[in-house]
């Protein structure tokens, strides 16, 4: 059996499970020997007390003999741990207030950190489901001027694929909204157009059926096949096993199902979930118009995904791709004018758009750092609580040590108590993490779907319990060692006397750290609050109040250009006549947002660099509806709004474009060249509109407005200014659309105010959470400050009594107490200001209209903490003034 024989093992197991009976036998045996030894002492002429004392000395300490016997007969470590847990539970039940405060202190920090960790895990860390070897995948992005739609064609991607040996595979993709019909009407679904061996590059295995064949992926294919997601399969086919070969209607066309994606896979990007995948050849069918995918200028794909060849690096792939792209630009000079100054960037990992990953990642790292700082503040407060508890238990520890308890056993018992508190704190922290998750619910990050709040999973729970355990080991050990050293260093005579100065400086240092760290969070929170205020005050160039946007898509349902124009005209006339509607218009883009196509605007015959302006095709009442002022000239007439661009109806320029082209001259009546993907046309300028912004942070967006006319659009926005609620307006407008054609989808209903607020969603979430963390940190710091000051008053009670006995005024006593608080605060403020500046520097790219050295923020934060310090000192000051000098001197 090795070190332990079978007989001894059986004895130890029996002792472990039947320990109570054996303990009674041991007690009886020891008592018998004590009585026999006491009788021998009495026979030698000793008194009864001396005989009993001599008998215990012979045994070398009764408790020690019991412990050594237990260790010899059983599993000592397990028995001791269980005994210590029971002892700690009884001790904590005797002091429920201490236990509740300690558990809540830890739970606050653990809950906050766990909630943010779970959010980061859900958004950034979890791999895309079903993907093989995700570490080998890279995202290739065409990056350049913000606000432009940069796309590559099927032919361009084929050339890049062939010229990049560092990649084992390269595929393009682009997301588009489509509609499918159900029994209740049209429903919007998310479609992804893919090029190349998209599924093969990702290493996916279909749940049912197959992926697209090489023939189906060719530019000349019919494009009439579809792969559906597992979610779509369940929602629309009830998970029927014979789904393969059946058809599904998307927009106005029908597609044959050839495969079902694996469960959990909803596309390369985690942005809400792709429902269906279509080959590139289906692009023309999507919009119900002929599009030759083989045409090199048929740019569709916004991002590419590649798999690195064995032994190749992302840097090498990026170098080869940039060289290949430069050759394409040189070979086809006219085709790449709008992206000639762009470049291909390679980024490791998939799951999020590169810009979203970088921006949201920074925000989540800031949140995680703030939550970790709050956890550290809670841990320090927890350590301080254990130190104060150690002070009150010095007498108990000293007595137990005198009775024979060893130093390791005493330390183990105190550590067990701390770990038990941490375990409860971790469990409560999981509950608080769920509550904090409610703050996330409905919150949106740019490029991500609204958070549903259900981000807490097994990893997050393990993180919570693990952090609580680590906290218990670290922040219970030091207070236990300090209090044990202090208790064992005292004599039995000193037990019960006033406490000494030992550990006082350490406790004060902990409180200084708490206050400084809390001030750091408070300064950062105030910076973010001012940022939100400044963002809300930005003049965007339109009046968003009571303006609602709705989406309709007649063209994908089979409408030609003329039918779509008639449909929009009828929508406008009927919506404008509804009660409560003050203005209505349609446009190709909503007034807020920067994701628009850029056109080249030049003066005829000029060799100057073209002005790139975001386009928007609008109806005549657009400017009235959104509240954008016409600074010169006029808006479109009702007749002009129905004209095709080739008829030269005229355009409206934004103020920035007008100044760039004409300087201070009046541009109204002048001709300009408008160049887009479909060619160049001469247009007269009929008006100049005030500048608008695509977001509160961006500058004025160069824009050109054209009449919507017979433009063929994948989606049209209906803009309504109303004196009604969004839901009421949605019902009215929806009924109009349904009465004209119930098969035309009606979706994306939201207020313009909501869209604007969403643009600063990350800043609002940061401000809300960092502000919450700062408030909790301030409360914890106030509690710590109160504890140190009250402890100081208790320790100096005799001194205060003597001072008052010899004539000290109450004001001087108050000054003594408050002065102690202010000394701690002054040191903490210096450290906190430095920490606040460092934190604000990290927040700099999130701040707007304010700098990390904003003096008002620091003054307000310091004043707030001064008030908190005074409030925390007030109870102790009152207690000090009420000290009775007579009773104090009598006790001495």
PLM-predicted stretches and their roles:
Residues 118-119, 345, 383, 419-488, ...:
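Small-residue-rich transmembrane alpha-helices
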Residues 126-177, 299-305, 535, 539-599:
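Membrane-proximal extracellular/periplasmic loop immediately following the first transmembrane helix
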Residues 378-422, 783-825, 829, 876-879, ...:
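Interfacial "coupling" helices/loops that link adjacent transmembrane helices in transporter permeases
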Residues 69-100, 132, 352-356, 386-412, ...:
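Alpha-helical transmembrane segments of integral membrane proteins
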Residues 5-7, 190-215, 223-363, 438, ...:
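Mid-to-C-terminal secondary-structure elements
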Residues 97-123, 378-379, 423-426, 507-531, ...:
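Short, strongly hydrophobic transmembrane alpha-helices
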């Amino acid at each position: 059996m090795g070190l332990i024989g079978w007989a001894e093992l059986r004895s130890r197991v029996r002792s472990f499970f039947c320990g109570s009976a054996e303990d009674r036998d041991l007690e009886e045996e020891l008592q018998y020997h004590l009585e026999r030894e006491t009788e021998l002492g009495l026979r030698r002429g000793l008194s009864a007390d001396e005989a009993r004392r001599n008998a215990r000395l012979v045994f070398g300490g009764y408790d020690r003999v019991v412990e050594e016997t237990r260790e010899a007969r059983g599993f000592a470590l397990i028995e001791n741990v269980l005994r210590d847990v029971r002892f700690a539970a009884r001790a904590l039940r005797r002091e429920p207030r201490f236990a509740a405060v300690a558990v809540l202190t830890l739970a606050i920090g653990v809950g906050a950190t766990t909630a943010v960790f779970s959010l980061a895990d859900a958004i950034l860390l979890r791999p895309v489901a079903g993907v093989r070897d995700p570490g080998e995948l890279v995202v290739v992005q065409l990056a350049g001027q913000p606000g432009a739609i940069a796309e590559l064609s099927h032919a361009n991607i084929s050339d890049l694929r062939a010229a990049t040996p560092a990649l084992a595979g390269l595929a393009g993709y682009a997301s588009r909204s489509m509609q499918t019909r159900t029994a209740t009407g049209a429903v919007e679904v998310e479609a992804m157009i893919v090029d190349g061996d998209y599924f093969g590059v990702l290493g996916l295995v279909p749940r049912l059926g197959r992926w697209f064949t090489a023939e189906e992926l060719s530019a000349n294919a019919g494009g009439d096949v579809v792969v559906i997601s597992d979610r779509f399969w369940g929602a629309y086919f009830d998970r029927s096993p014979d789904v393969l070969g059946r058809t599904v209607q998307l927009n106005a066309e029908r597609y044959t199902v050839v495969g079902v994606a694996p469960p959990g896979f909803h596309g390369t990007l985690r942005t809400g979930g792709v429902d269906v995948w279509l080959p590139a050849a289906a692009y023309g069918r999507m919009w119900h118009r002929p599009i030759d995918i083989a045409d090199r200028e048929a740019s569709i794909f916004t991002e590419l995904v590649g798999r690195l060849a064995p032994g190749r690096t992302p840097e090498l792939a990026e170098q080869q791709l940039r060289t290949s792209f430069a050759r394409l630009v040189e070979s086809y000079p006219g085709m790449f004018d709008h992206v000639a100054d762009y470049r291909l960037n390679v980024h490791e990992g998939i799951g999020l758009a590169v810009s979203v990953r970088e921006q949201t990642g920074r925000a989540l790292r800031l949140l995680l750092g703030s939550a970790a700082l709050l956890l550290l503040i809670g841990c320090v407060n927890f350590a301080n609580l254990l130190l104060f508890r150690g002070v009150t238990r010095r007498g108990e520890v000293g007595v137990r040590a005198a009775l024979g308890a060893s130093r390791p056993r005493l330390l183990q018992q105190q550590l067990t108590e701390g770990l038990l508190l941490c375990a409860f704190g971790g469990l409560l922290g999981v509950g608080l993490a769920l509550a904090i998750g409610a703050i996330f619910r409905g919150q949106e990050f740019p490029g991500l779907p609204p958070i549903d709040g259900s981000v807490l999973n097994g990893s997050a729970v393990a993180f919570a319990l693990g952090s609580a355990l680590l906290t218990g080991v670290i922040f219970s050990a030091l207070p236990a060692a300090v209090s044990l050293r202090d208790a064992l260093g005292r004599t039995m005579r000193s037990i019960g006397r006033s406490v000494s100065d030992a550990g006082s400086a350490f406790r004060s240092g902990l409180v200084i750290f708490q206050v400084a760290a809390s001030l750091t969070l408070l300064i950062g929170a105030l910076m973010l609050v001012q940022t939100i205020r400044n963002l809300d005050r930005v003049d965007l160039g339109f009046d968003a109040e009571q303006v609602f946007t709705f989406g309709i898509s007649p063209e994908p349902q089979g409408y030609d250009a003329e039918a779509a124009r008639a449909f929009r005209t009828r929508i406008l006339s009927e919506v404008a006549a509804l009660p409560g509607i003050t203005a209505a218009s349609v446009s190709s883009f909503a007034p807020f947002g920067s994701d628009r196509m850029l056109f080249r605007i030049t003066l005829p015959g000029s060799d100057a660099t073209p002005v790139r302006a975001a386009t928007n095709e609008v109806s005549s009442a657009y400017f009235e509806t959104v509240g954008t002022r016409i600074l010169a000239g006029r808006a479109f007439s009702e007749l002009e709004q129905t004209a095709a661009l080739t008829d030269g109806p005229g355009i409206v320029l934004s103020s920035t474009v007008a100044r760039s082209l004409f300087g201070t001259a009046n541009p109204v009546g002048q001709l300009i060249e408008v160049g887009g993907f479909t060619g160049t046309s001469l247009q007269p300028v009929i008006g100049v509109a005030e500048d608008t912004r695509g977001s509160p942070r961006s500058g004025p967006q160069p824009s050109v407005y054209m009449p919507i006319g017979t433009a063929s659009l994948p989606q049209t926005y209906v803009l309504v200014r109303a004196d009604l609620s969004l839901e009421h307006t949605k019902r009215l407008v929806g009924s109009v659309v349904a009465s004209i054609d119930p098969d035309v989808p009606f979706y994306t209903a939201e207020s313009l105010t909501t869209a604007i607020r969403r643009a600063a969603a990350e800043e609002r979430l940061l401000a809300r959470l960092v502000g919450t963390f700062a408030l909790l940190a301030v409360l914890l710091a106030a509690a710590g400050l109160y504890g140190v000051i009250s402890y100081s008053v208790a320790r100096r009670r005799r001194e205060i009594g003597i001072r008052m006995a010899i004539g000290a005024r109450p004001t001087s006593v108050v000054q003594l107490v408050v002065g102690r608080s202010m000394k701690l605060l002054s040191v903490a403020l210096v450290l906190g200001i430095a920490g606040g500046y460092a934190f604000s520097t990290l927040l700099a790219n999130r701040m707007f209209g304010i700098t990390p050295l904003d003096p008002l923020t620091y003054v307000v934060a310091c004043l707030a903490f001064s008030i908190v310090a005074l409030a925390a000192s007030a109870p102790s000051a009152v207690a000090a003034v009420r000290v009775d000098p007579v009773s104090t001197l009598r006790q001495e």
